[in-house]
Amino acid sequence: MSFEQKPKVTVILANLGTPDEATVPAVRRFLKQFLSDPRVIEIPKFIWWIILNLFVLPFRPKRAAHAYASVWSTDSPMREIVFEQTQRVQAYLERENKQFDLTVLPAMTYGNLGIDAVLEKLSAHPQEHVILLPLFPQYSATSTAPLYDAFAKWIPTQRNLPGLTIIKDYYQHPMFIQALAESVLAYQEQHGKPEKLLMSFHGIPQPYADKGDPYADRCRITAKLVAEALHLKDDEWAISFQSRFGKQEWVKPYTDQLLQDWAKQGVKSVQVLSPAFSADCLETLEELAIQNAELFQQAGGGSYAYIPALNSDQAHIDLLAGLVQANLDALTHTLAHR
């Protein structure tokens, strides 16, 4: 590399993934890849193969495709949001980092824009440094770790390796907590304050937590910090976990059960925030916003509202870009002194 060339740096913003279409075949392809990852399902491979292929994939894609169709526009909501996040973070970082030839790329763990394909493209263009920002605020072996696995598989195939930074998570970053609190206040300024604010996170099986996955504890820290930022009393908010799958115990309390209990106790108004999601997707727009509203109201509850994810809010873009910028500043210092 000549001294006149700018160091080439690629930033990867990675989310979970989404089907290509809201159709049964597309959903089946996506679910097969997702649910075949041993990071996601920790069941002996042969036993899980039978369950997946005989009891899950023949039935679940039809129900899921119908759910996807209810939230689909011209594309998957998650993919549209991740594209916009990528473009806006790129504009921010280009403005602040003239010293680098800098590119920001979207990636998904599963489905199209897969992390493996993104890394393969980098092989043709040697990089000075690669920064991976998983868009999972709270680390889990079920979500963030598969991205580490992708890099571990890619690294032995490369001769001229780049420097590599992986931003593990940001569950208690002050800008993250502030952005969440501001999103709640902005929503309540328009729609009023409820009796209860529920912070509902995607769940994981309890045995995963027992074996050392820090996810649930990090979710609890996020929720507590948001509640403190909002000056909420203990009886004005709660944390719960949604989307349990199968018959084993998952981390508790369960979102659906808590909402029904509240309704039976006479709680009439609830707003739900899901700080585990950096982009709205099927789970937030259909399960949280629609299914759980029906559960709450059928059990006797009244007003129910889902507060959107941070998505492409300016405070969120500032957070994501800021996380990367801190590493670019360190890289600038390193390159200047080597």
Swiss-Prot record:
Pfam families: Ferrochelatase
Listed pathway(s): Porphyrin-containing compound metabolism; protoheme biosynthesis; protoheme from protoporphyrin-IX: step 1/1
Gene Ontology molecular function terms on file: ferrochelatase activity; metal ion binding
Record-listed Fe cation binding positions: 202, 283
Record's GO cellular component terms: cytoplasm
Main subcellular location of this protein, as a coarse class: cytoplasm
Any one biological process term the GO annotation gives: heme biosynthetic process
Entry EC number(s): 4.98.1.1
Keyword Ribosomal protein recorded: no
Signal peptide segment: none
Database matches in Gene3D superfamilies: 3.40.50.1400
Cited InterPro entries: Ferrochelatase, Ferrochelatase_AS, Ferrochelatase_C, Ferrochelatase_N
Tree of life domain: Bacteria
Localization per record: Cytoplasm
Keywords: Cytoplasm, Heme biosynthesis, Iron, Lyase, Metal-binding, Porphyrin biosynthesis
Catalytic activities: heme b + 2 H(+) = protoporphyrin IX + Fe(2+)
Keyword Glycoprotein listed: no
Function: Catalyzes the ferrous insertion into protoporphyrin IX.
Similarity-based family: Belongs to the ferrochelatase family.
Protein name in UniProt: Ferrochelatase
Annotated organism of origin: Acinetobacter baumannii (strain SDF)
Lineage per the UniProt record: Bacteria, Pseudomonadati, Pseudomonadota, Gammaproteobacteria, Moraxellales
Encoding gene (name): hemH
